[in-house]
């Protein structure tokens, strides 16, 4: 029989139950017992959903209150000293690492009680993980209590449980050395000891299978790391415990032979992104090794072409027999929970989709077809084929006018009138900004009042006119506060926006939205990615009226705020029936019209955010340049239609810039603002070494932490930035938008930021 298993399930709940419970706990509204009860219920529901869909081996340990990489750090006892305190619960220590804490005692440092761990992108996804920290004092020690508790709970439902654990080599690869310690692999022997102890503990619990996730096998691995895999997995063998080595997010390519020959009982491959690996692995796989085929895309929401997949899988089944397992390509963490919850979605489009629950049902259909013949699931296969054909032919998908515009894109469409050196002189003359000009990234707190009014408008309780009146009041409040604080370049605060991608997608043709299509971005932060189902175009102006209104309230410049084409692409569920480049070009042309309309309305500082630029990089460096070429082109198509005195800003966060600095320079934005405070300005080294030519605003405080930065802390960070970059090219700003913060935190933080800029201006005057 063909076995169906799952690598992981969404943890947040179909209605974001975990998010709301965690946030209530952080506010002190519920205690740990109540939080644990919510988590217990969610796990039970998720496991039952998987069992009902025919999953044979349940994943255990994929649930997390915040982040599975942070869970691994606690599993192996790698807890930063700064987060530890006497009398503090393990859960509070956990959240302290994740979120940091505000200053609690007079003796605390200037930057508050405890800063949060650094956060960065999980491979090429929109999920963020908390970076493990390694230093000379790091010593690993097993703490498997969380995993064992969840194991006991799962066994109340089935005996077939499979712990899911981040593998030791991927854990070290993703970590960061915080002092001058040895190479990351220098920590490996100590870590292997803990992993071996963990396997021994699981064996005593009569666990039969354990899944080690090693996604770094989809990367370009140095030779010493390849050798480390051989050494580690020879040591991670126990006679009564089978190891499934799981890889995902891309083809293994040069690492395929290595992975296939490791002494594990099973190997999982993502063939949705590495289809060429499948025929190759069949020729080198040990005859006794199980092959888990990740055949259903765990990162997108489109219904799979089951008939096409069956044609691909049948010869594999004939060759492997019971040695064939089926699974999603990766954890379903990256997909919404259940399409059945969607009641307002266009019926045609809904029929083209599959969320986590439906993806497991697709696996069940494939399993039954392979084991019992296609006639056993004939009705399901006919329905699937009809949905695939209907999508391909739909007039909702295809727009001849948009396709013509894309076909006629010329190089001149992506070039500014003059080089930066000419533009910046004209811009300085026009705006007359001080040294170290201050600004924010765009959004201000989305208060409960804002959310209440938006909900009332969407439900029809208040009219468009009433809703607009509340938004104008919020904008006026934001402008007044910024002027009072003394910020130089203002923003309108984005009160009208629920999400930086969803807001634009709602007003572009070719996009559709769900009610409950939530996925986790980080911690309790959930996003509801729009779905790009067809050709994209802009039927009307999107932001111009709000920007015009904000500008009418002040003599200071107000930035227009747009989300860039690559971020619109990366943070959406993207159609899979044409190259991503084409979809990016369609979005870029739509945004170009918006940028030009903003300029015509007198908004001449325009920010086009691209926080997801690096996220789109293919995992293999040989594929980078092709992506960067069309990604940069898309940004420039969006922004290059303006005059020299119009200043284009862009914003990026959570990224290492060294290896894409040329592409960032090629964007030719007049000002770039970046996330740097969590890395203590380390990210600026890329701009210094490259001699980045344009203006730059390194983030001077971490908005993801509740800490309020002291003026002295901000001064220190600005001075550190000035060691790397000329003072006259520096802007002062937070790391990111302030949407998720509270006004009582934002106001003093911005006041301290502005005071720091004023202090340094006085010093250099």
Curated annotation (Swiss-Prot):
Binding locations of Zn(2+): 651, 653, 675, 736
UniProt-annotated binding residues for L-homocysteine: 441-443, 494, 609
Active site location: 704 (proton donor)
UniProt KW keywords: Amino-acid biosynthesis, Metal-binding, Methionine biosynthesis, Methyltransferase, Repeat, Transferase, Zinc
InterPro entries, A to Z: Cbl-indep_Met_Synth_N (IPR013215), Cobalamin-indep_Met_synthase (IPR006276), Met_Synth_C/arc (IPR002629), UROD/MetE-like_sf (IPR038071)
UniProt pathway: Amino-acid biosynthesis; L-methionine biosynthesis via de novo pathway; L-methionine from L-homocysteine (MetE route): step 1/1
Domain of life: Bacteria
EC code: 2.1.1.14
Cofactor: how and how many bound: Binds 1 zinc ion per subunit.
GO annotation (BP), single: methylation
Disulphide-bonded residues: none
Residue numbers binding 5-methyltetrahydropteroyltri-L-glutamate: 16-19, 121, 525-526, 571, 615
Tagged with keyword Membrane: no
CDD domains in UniProt: CIMS_C_terminal_like, CIMS_N_terminal_like
Catalytic activity: 5-methyltetrahydropteroyltri-L-glutamate + L-homocysteine = tetrahydropteroyltri-L-glutamate + L-methionine
Top-level EC class: transferase
Cofactor(s), by name: Zn(2+)
Binding-site residues, L-methionine: 441-443, 494, 609
GO molecular function annotation: 5-methyltetrahydropteroyltriglutamate-homocysteine S-methyltransferase activity; zinc ion binding
The protein's role, per its UniProt record: Catalyzes the transfer of a methyl group from 5-methyltetrahydrofolate to homocysteine resulting in methionine formation.
Family, as annotated: Belongs to the vitamin-B12 independent methionine synthase family.
NCBIfam families reported in the protein's UniProt record: met_syn_B12ind (TIGR01371), PRK05222.1 (NF003556)
Record protein name field: 5-methyltetrahydropteroyltriglutamate--homocysteine methyltransferase
């Amino acid at each position: 029989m063909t076995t169906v298993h799952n690598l992981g399930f969404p943890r947040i709940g179909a209605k974001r139950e975990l998010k709301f419970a965690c946030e209530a706990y952080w506010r002190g509204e519920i205690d740990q017992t109540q939080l644990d009860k919510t988590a217990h219920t969610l796990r039970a529901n998720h496991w039952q959903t998987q069992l009902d869909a025919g999953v044979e081996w349940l994943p255990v340990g994929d649930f997390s209150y915040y982040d599975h990489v942070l869970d691994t750090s606690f599993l192996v006892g790698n807890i930063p000293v700064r987060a530890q305190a006497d009398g503090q619960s393990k859960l509070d220590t956990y959240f302290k690492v994740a979120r940091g804490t505000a200053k609690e005692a007079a003796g605390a440092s200037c930057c508050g009680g405890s800063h949060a761990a650094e956060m960065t992108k999980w491979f090429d996804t929109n999920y963020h993980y908390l970076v493990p920290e390694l230093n000379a004092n790091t010593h690993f020690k097993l703490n498997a209590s969380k995993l064992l508790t969840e194991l006991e709970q799962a066994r109340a439902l089935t005996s077939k449980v499979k712990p899911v654990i981040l593998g030791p080599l991927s854990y070290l690869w993703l970590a960061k050395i915080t002092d001058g310690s040895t190479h990351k692999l220098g920590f490996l022997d100590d870590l292997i000891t803990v992993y071996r102890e963990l396997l021994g503990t699981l064996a005593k619990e009569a666990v039969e299978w354990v899944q080690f996730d090693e996604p770094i096998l989809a990367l370009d691995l140095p030779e010493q790391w390849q050798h480390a895999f051989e050494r580690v997995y020879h040591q991670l063998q126990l006679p009564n415990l089978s190891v499934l080595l799981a890889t995902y997010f891309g083809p293994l390519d040069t690492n395929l032979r290595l992975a296939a020959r490791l002494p594990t009982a099973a190997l999982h491959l993502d063939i949705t992104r590495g289809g060429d690996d499948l025929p190759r692995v069949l020729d080198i796989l040990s005859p006794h090794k199980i092959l888990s085929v990740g055949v259903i895309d765990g990162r997108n929401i489109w219904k799979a072409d089951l008939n096409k997949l069956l044609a691909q899988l049948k010869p594999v089944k004939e060759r492997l027999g019971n040695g064939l397992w089926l699974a999603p390509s990766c954890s379903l963490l990256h997909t919404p929970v259940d399409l059945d919850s969607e009641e307002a979605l266009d019926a045609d489009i809904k029929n083209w989709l599959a969320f986590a629950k439906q993806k497991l049902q697709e696996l069940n259909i494939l399993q039954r077809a392979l084991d019992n013949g296609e006639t056993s699931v004939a009705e399901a296969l006919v329905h699937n084929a009809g949905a695939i054909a209907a999508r391909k032919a739909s007039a909702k998908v295809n727009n001849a006018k948009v396709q013509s515009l894309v076909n006629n894109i010329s190089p001149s469409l992506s070039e500014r009138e003059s080089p930066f050196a000419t533009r910046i002189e004209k811009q300085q003359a026009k705006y007359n900004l001080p040294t170290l000009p201050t600004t924010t990234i765009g959004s201000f707190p989305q208060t409960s009042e804002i959310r209440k009014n938006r909900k009332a408008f969407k439900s029809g309780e208040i009219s468009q006119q009433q809703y607009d009146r509340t938004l104008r009041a919020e904008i006026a409040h934001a402008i007044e506060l910024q002027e009072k604080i003394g910020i130089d370049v203002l923003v309108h605060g984005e009160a009208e926006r629920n999400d930086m991608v969803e807001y634009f997608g709602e007003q572009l043709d070719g996009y559709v939205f769900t009610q409950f299509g939530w996925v986790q971005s980080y911690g309790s932060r959930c996003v509801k990615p729009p779905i790009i189902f067809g050709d994209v175009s802009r039927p009307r102006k999107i932001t111009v009226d709000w920007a015009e209104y904000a500008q009418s309230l002040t003599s200071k410049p107000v930035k227009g705020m747009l989300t860039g084409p690559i971020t619109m692409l990366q943070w959406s569920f993207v159609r899979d029936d044409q190259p991503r480049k084409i979809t990016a070009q369609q979005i870029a042309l739509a945004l170009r019209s918006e940028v030009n309309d903003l300029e015509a309305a007198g908004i001449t500082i325009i920010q086009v955010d691209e926080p997801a630029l690096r996220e789109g990089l293919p995992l293999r460096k040989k594929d980078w340049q092709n992506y960067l070429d069309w990604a940069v082109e898309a940004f420039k198509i969006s922004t290059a239609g303006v005059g020299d005195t119009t200043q284009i800003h862009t914003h990026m966060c959570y990224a290492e810039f060294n290896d894409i600095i040329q592409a960032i320079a090629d964007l030719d934005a007049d000002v770039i603002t970046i996330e740097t405070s969590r890395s203590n300005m380390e990210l600026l080294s890329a701009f210094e070494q490259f001699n980045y030519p344009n203006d730059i605003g390194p983030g001077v405080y971490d908005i993801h932490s509740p800490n309020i930065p002291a003026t002295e802390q901000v001064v220190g960070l600005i001075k550190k930035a000035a060691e790397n970059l000329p003072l006259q090219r520096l802007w002062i700003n937070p790391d990111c938008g302030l949407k998720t913060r509270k006004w009582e935190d934002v106001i003093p933080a911005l006041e301290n930021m502005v005071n720091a800029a004023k202090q340094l201006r006085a010093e250099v005057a």
